[in-house]
């Protein structure tokens, strides 16, 4: 700017921008579960490794009697910055993806198994049921298409989403995302909607 005598605007690409900041904390998570012959989920075991220990992100709301959730520290020489709901966005994906595997092992519909294990949590159920209803859960889907459901609690808010996908020549395309949220009293409903919409776009 000094050489040319005029202001210069510099815009980094996404790839360049990510190289000029510290990283999100890396984390790995291992799961095991015990499922009885009648489909009852007996135990849930989760051991995860990361530099810091999140307080509530790995905790599941499901009524599984035997739960073991354990953290081990993973020292790193890299500086990290836990911004933007890091723990919840990571552990929410881990736990809900594994829960679907548990549902398959139990021979249960993933939505119905969630309902069964949330019978004493009416607030969770209301959000889950609303997302499933608006998405038309249970309606037939065509070959090559898929539908998944998830539920996560973060900072006092409950969010459930149903995603419809299409697989074409081995590539996954997202057709629709249905999102339901209970954030308590919303001072700015438009702000809540914008947060959900932008979060979905960011995730994609």
Which residues make up each language-model segment?
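Cofactor-binding beta-sheet edge motifs in enzyme active sites
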Residues: 1-203
